[in-house]
Amino acid sequence: MTTTTDVLPMLITDVEVVSVERLSPSFVRVVLGAAALADFGVDGPRYDQRMKLVFPDPRTGCLSSAGEAGGSWTTTWLERPAEERGHMRTYTIRDVRGSGADTTIVVDIVLHLEGDQVGPGSTWAAVAAPGDRLVLVAPRRGFEFGGIEFAPSVGAELLMVADETAVPAVCAVLEQLSPTVTGAAFIEVPTAGDVLDVRGPVGVSVTWLVRGQAPLGQRLHDAVVGHLGIGPADVDVAADDVDPDLWETPTFSSSGEEIPATRAVGHELDGLYAWIAGESTVVTGLRRHLVNELQVDRSQVAFMGYWRRGVAMRS
């Protein structure tokens, strides 16, 4: 195992597919292994911990190797043409199994194989097989890495809202919560076959919403408004009024919005902690409902645009 002397604060390594499982029409579970994963780790719960995966270029099949990754690896990687280096995307660590050199990382990948959302991750996952190789960038034990946004205050009432792209994150969080936590999770998926078995605290209700032919996010919006029981129901958002990099947490705002140093008290929803992730337009609408209309304090919310309809995902 490496020491903390002269090593990168992140783990950059080649990994190999150990197994592939089709969980549902829209989800593929891939288990990744490498001896270097012995150095993977975070201090405390992983919750919605993010990592990076580099996929082969779908046209050429080329993929850069992590090799002896040094501090300039990312810069060197970016300088190469995409058709040679591969494509980097962000995923949630769904689970970690084993220990030492036998450590494996589980990632659930959404299959967007039609329309304008086809990407290198979906393309790769649809045909992935044991022995296939990727490059992984993840937390190294003993170093700050970031990538965990779920951070409720002690005793907060949870509200978790997700579309299919955030299902791995919600499920990972639910399985790591203290058994005394209470709240509600609303999860929208494309089909009834995408409803997965997830175990969380008995005090957290989990509602799966099947989109079917409904507009993207409509069932989520209606469920959240109904759950909160207050405020107007109309949260229509114009396409040109959406931050393509929407990412707002109690400590960060992608829009540069000033984040209050102190939180308001005495509000009807004081004690709520909302974690909302998915398509940026849907997330923007829900953000307006909670923050603008219901006046939920910014310290109580995390809004994350995991993707934007009609826009190619970036690394």
Predicted regions and their residues:
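Extended, composition-driven regions rather than compact fold-specific motifs
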Residues: 1-315
